[in-house]
Amino acid sequence: MVLIGGRTHLLPHEPAALGVALGECLQQDGIELVLDVRAIAARRENSEYVLRLEDGREFRGDRILVATGRRPRTADIGLETVGIEATQGGIPVDTRMRAGERLWAIGDVTGLWQLTHVGKYQGRVAAANILGEPREAHYEAVPRVVYTDPQAAAVGAKSGPFRATAKLSQVAKMATYTRVAAESNGFLTLFSDGQRLTGAVALGPEAGEWIQQATLAIAARIPLPVLGDTIQPFPTFSEVYLEALKSLHQAIQA
């Protein structure tokens, strides 16, 4: 398998360390990475597909999977009849998901976050407002998960005044996972303003599950001392928070 991308590392919208580490994992699994170059043409030759890159290289294979993202479909659905003017990014909405008088929009069509769980969240916000229960949508703690093996996950800010990283191998050797996972390059990085968590990125088995501790901490603005005093179950990957928070405390006190 060959993975071709136009950026210098995978997951270009996340901190570089996450994309680089994921790339190393994929390469260990035998996937060839061809980065910082774009595909410009494709053709069929007999039973093979041929993909040509802008630097002249060609790759042959049985299948080509093109991942180009998606765009909100707002044309020809009658928006003009209800006084709504969509932009290239989608249908503009306010914090209560209102697109206009007695009109609401949720999900990908808003162009805000093209994630299923965000669409569900927006649906709950819209439903509450429709029922006369004022509620606003907030996006400071949106979890983002890439379901590779291992999983890559992130939430909140992508940088901050203070940061600390803990390797998953510090705790995985005691967890109920295989030794292969324990020896992986998985990690947890926390970002902070000095008082609370503002962001986190993680790589490792089921990272989309244990990133949720950071999601809740950011959403609820939980003070760092409270997080540091939280008991983590043994043996689990969640113990990596203890190491990361200890390092974060040292960075803040330095």
Annotate the PLM regions:
Residues M1-E48, L115-K120, A128-G160:
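Rossmann-like dinucleotide-binding cores of NAD(P)H-dependent redox enzymes
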Residues G6, D108, A202-L203:
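Cofactor-binding loop segments of dinucleotide-utilizing enzymes, especially the Rossmann-like FAD-
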Residues L26, L79, G123, Q195, ...:
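Residue-level signature of catalytic and energy-coupling elements of molecular machines
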Residues R43-E58, I64:
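Conserved beta-strand-loop-beta-strand element in the redox core of flavoprotein oxidoreductases
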Residues R44-Y49, G100, A182-N185:
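A short, glycine/Asx- and small/polar-enriched loop/turn
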Residues E58-N129:
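FAD-site-proximal beta/loop scaffold in flavoenzymes
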Residues E136, Y147-A254:
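Flexible, glycine-rich terminal cap/loop adjacent to redox cofactors
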